[in-house]
């Protein structure tokens, strides 16, 4: 190509690029002008409104090269109207129990970072139900899992996590530090209590709304301890049952009434109950009932009835001849409302629960009389008051070929129903002492709630193969 041809070619290319650039600039200008008028002329349509006023603001920013039009929707949300929970509703009718949640923590922990826990429970608030447990500060596969059969150490803490998940270091929240706990929501915020320290000088720290509010010193110097399941609140008053003293002799039990984490009143245990530990509490019709563990004598469970309005209580024993502690003797021909029914070995007791509602009463217990295996629910009308009361319905929760453990009550007091639907959980213990081929002791959780329908039974056992952990 001669020099003249090169000049002509370069000139033509330059002119072509100039024309293309001009066309792009004109198109850009037209597009911006069109968008501007389209936004300005279009009436408001279908913008979402949530609990407040919805306004549209158009902001036009000019600079030398482009016109930018930004449309911002500003949603003003009213602050939630928070109120203390009121226990005015009755319990719902229950004819059977439907599955609510199962976390499968041990199965998942075979190949994931799952925390070692025990003493689990569930507790609800206005927006969600959460799982709780006392962590051992290590994972199932961690070397520190050796020795987690022990109940009390400096490494335990009350943790909570979203219901249905397995507890891991990545999805749990520490509520407080300690080796015994309870927690409940009063409708405005959550109160959590943890006991920690040496056996002869333990103490409790009461947290409310995420902050420590009250401290309680040991009053008997012998393992200050509490419920290991949720407390219950009525109009801001949250009674909690605490015990300090021997596990196999007379101890000192107190009912402490809290409001926003602060002590309102303290009562010494009154009534015929002789030993109280690990109460499972629920509320209905402005009364709170706690079904507890007599670790000293009774295979029948003590019952504490609390009036949160007057901040008073009474205690007795479950009248039914259906015994629900473990270990226990065979069911006798008659129950006892005022004294413990002795017998059973080798275990002195286990945390349990009941819902006591006249003809709508249900009792939970291990299937085995002697060990923490299996779990069943028995409908026993008038179990609270009739020493001849017997089962009229039965549902297996865990078959007797599988381990169970602690169990307790909880209710979603914020559910949109005309009654409070009873719910319960069962701790599914795995590892030591029964399965000594692993170094740890931990659990998974299964939870069920009441149904008016008559549903079938199924065994909701843990399901982990311990051999996979070797």
Set out the residue ranges of the language-model regions.
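Heptad-repeat coiled-coil amphipathic alpha-helices that mediate oligomerization/assembly
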Residues: 7, 11-14, 21, 28, ...
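N-linked glycosylation sites
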Residues: 51-54, 67-70, 86, 146, ...
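An edge-strand/N-cap motif at the start of beta-rich repeat modules
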Residues: 83-114, 120
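A short beta-strand motif characteristic of beta-propeller blades
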Residues: 104-106, 214-219, 264-269
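Repeated scaffold domains used in trafficking and secretory/extracellular systems
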Residues: 112-121, 171-183, 223-231, 273-280, ...
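Short beta-strand elements that form the blades of beta-propeller/WD-repeat-like
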Residues: 115, 130-135, 189-196, 237-243, ...
């Amino acid at each position: 190509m001669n020099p003249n041809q090169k000049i002509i070619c370069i000139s033509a290319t330059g002119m072509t690029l100039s024309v293309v650039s001009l066309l792009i600039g004109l198109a850009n200008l037209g597009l911006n002008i069109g968008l501007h008028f389209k936004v300005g002329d279009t009436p408001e349509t279908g913008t979402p409104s949530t609990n407040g006023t919805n306004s549209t603001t158009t902001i036009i920013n000019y600079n030398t090269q482009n016109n930018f039009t930004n449309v911002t929707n500003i949603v003003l949300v009213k602050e939630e109207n928070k109120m203390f929970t009121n226990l005015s509703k009755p319990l719902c009718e229950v004819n059977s129990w439907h599955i609510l949640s199962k976390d499968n923590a041990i199965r998942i922990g075979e190949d994931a970072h799952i925390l070692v826990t025990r003493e689990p429970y569930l507790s609800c608030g206005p927006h969600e139900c959460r799982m709780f447990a006392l962590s051992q500060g290590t994972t199932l596969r961690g070397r520190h899992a050796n020795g987690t059969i022990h109940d009390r150490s400096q490494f335990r803490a009350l943790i909570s996590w979203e219901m249905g998940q397995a507890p891991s270091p990545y999805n749990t929240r520490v509520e407080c530090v300690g080796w015994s706990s309870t927690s409940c929501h009063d409708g405005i915020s959550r109160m959590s209590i943890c006991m920690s320290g040496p056996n002869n000088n333990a103490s409790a720290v009461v947290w409310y709304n995420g902050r420590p509010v009250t401290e309680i010193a040991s009053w008997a110097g012998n393992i200050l301890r509490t419920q290991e399941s949720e407390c219950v609140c009525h109009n801001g008053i949250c009674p909690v049952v605490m015990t300090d003293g021997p596990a196999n002799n007379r101890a000192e039990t107190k009912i402490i009434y809290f409001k926003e984490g602060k002590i309102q009143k303290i009562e010494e245990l009154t009534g015929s109950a002789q030993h109280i530990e690990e109460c499972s509490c629920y509320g209905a019709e402005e009364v709170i009932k706690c079904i507890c563990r007599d670790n000293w004598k009774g295979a029948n469970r003590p019952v504490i009835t609390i009036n949160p309005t007057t901040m008073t209580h009474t205690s007795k024993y479950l009248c039914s001849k259906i015994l629900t502690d473990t270990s226990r003797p065979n069911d006798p021909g008659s129950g006892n409302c005022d004294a413990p029914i002795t017998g059973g070995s080798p275990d002195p007791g286990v945390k349990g629960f009941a819902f006591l509602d006249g003809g709508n009463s249900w009792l939970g217990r291990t299937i085995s009389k002697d060990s923490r295996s299996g779990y069943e629910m028995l409908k026993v009308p008038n179990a609270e008051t009739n020493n001849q009361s017997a089962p009229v319905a039965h549902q297996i929760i865990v078959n007797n070929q599988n381990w169970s453990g602690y169990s307790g009550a909880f209710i979603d007091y914020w559910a949109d129903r005309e009654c409070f639907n009873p719910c319960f959980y069962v701790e599914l213990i795995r590892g030591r002492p029964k399965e000594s081929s692993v170094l740890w002791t931990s659990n998974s959780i299964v939870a069920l709630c009441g149904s008016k329908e008559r549903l079938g039974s199924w065994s909701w056992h843990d399901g982990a193969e311990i051999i996979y952990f070797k």
